[in-house]
Amino acid sequence: MDYLVQSVPSKSGLASPERYREDVVEEPLTERGRRSRERIVDAAAALVAERGAGGARLDQILEAAGASKSQLYHYFSDKEDLVRAVIARRVGETVHCQGPQLDKVDSLAALRRWFDWLVDQNAERDCPGCPLGALASELADCDEAARGDLTCGFDTWIGYVIEGIERMKVSGELDERADPRRLGVAVFASLQGGLLLSKTYKDPQYLRDALDATYDHFLSLRAHHPGAPKRPPG
C-alpha cells in the first residue's frame, strides 16, 4: 500500500509533496472500518513512541487496540506496512502543527517567534525529542520503504522552512548571500540536533542554544537598512 503521494521536484531542489496523505490507497469503505483502522494505528503509534518500531509487538498493538489479527491483516499487509501508517500519522501531525506556524514566517522577527515557540513547546512537554527523528534513527538503515516515507515527510517540513526564508529574502530582510535551500536545511538540522540533545540531557536549553546560534547566522545575512531587527537579549 502507498501512504504518500509522489514527491515532485521543487525549486528548492528538495522533493516537495503537494500534500502528505495519512490515508491509504485502499481506504476502508465503511465508517466502522475506518474507525477500526484508526484504533490500530493509534495503538501502534503509542507503542512505537514508547518502545520503538522494533520493540512494539503486533500482539501488544492488537491488545491495546482491542482488535483481532484478521482486522489487522485486512488493513495492513504486515508489520512494516503498519509502521508506514504510523510514519504517515506522525508526519500528518507534524505538518498540521508546524505548517500554520511556518506560514507566518516572513521576517526575522517572525523567525525568532517560531524559534521561541519551538523551545517553549519542547520545555512544556519535558523534552520528548522528535518522533520522526526517532523513527529515522531506527529505520533509515533497515527499511527502505520507511526511509522513503520519512525523507518525503522531512522534505515537506523543510519545504515550509524554505518558503518562509524565501519570503524573507523577497521582502528585502536578507541579502543576496542568503540561500533559502541551504538555510532551510541548516535550520532543520539545528532543530533536530537540538531536540535530540534536549531529550538526552532533559534540558530545553540545548534546543535554545542551537536555534539561537542559527538565528545569529540569519542576522549576519540581513540586509543593511534602517530598522533591521537585532537579536533580542536573553
For the regions a protein language model found, what residue spans apply to each?
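N-terminal intrinsically disordered/low-complexity leader segments
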Residues: 1-35, 224-234
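Hydrophobic alpha-helical segments that form the core
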Residues: 2-4, 133, 178-197, 213-217
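Helix-turn-helix
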Residues: 39, 43, 47-81, 85
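Hydrophobic alpha-helical connector segments
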Residues: 85, 98-128, 180-187
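Short, basic, alpha-helical segments at the C-terminal edge of helix-turn-helix-like DNA-binding modules
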Residues: 88-94
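Amphipathic alpha-helical segments used for helix-helix packing
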Residues: 109-110, 124-145
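Amphipathic C-terminal alpha-helical segment
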Residues: 121, 167, 188-205, 217-227
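Hydrophobic alpha-helical bundle segments that form small-molecule/ligand-binding pockets
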Residues: 142-144, 155-183, 218-231
